[in-house]
Amino acid sequence: MLKKIKTLMLISGIADVLQMMPLFLALFSPEIKTFFMEDGIQGSSQNPMAVEVFNIFFLVFAFLGLAFIVATFVARTFENLEVLQKSSLLLAIYHLAWALPDFINITMGKPHAPLLIMLLSLIPVVSLFYAWKNGEL
């Protein structure tokens, strides 16, 4: 059974990279950015103010995503079981806060991330909470 905290954090970090990939790609690909903009609000890619807002949105969320990834991989370097467990708890709480809005929106029939991304966002939440409660060195 998977109980090694560092392995669970590695799985979480890989899931983070996979779920953030479309966001990172949107920063460098005008086609992907336009797709996301039009998927969210039709006609927004034609409005210069909306484009600016989306550019800021993509940049802020890309940095947040990068922070999640870096924090997860840095936490893997800790050697103390208690520190690893507390780090897992803190990371799990942040990941839950990141994932929860999409799940609330889907239950309310509002726009949300694609289901694959939503499922990927659950992997870190579950693995990090599990590491906090049951993890071993």
Predicted regions and their residues:
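Alpha-helical transmembrane segments and their helix-start/interface "positive-inside/aromatic belt" motifs
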Residues: 1-15
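Membrane-helix boundary connector in multi-pass membrane proteins
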Residues: 97-117, 132-137
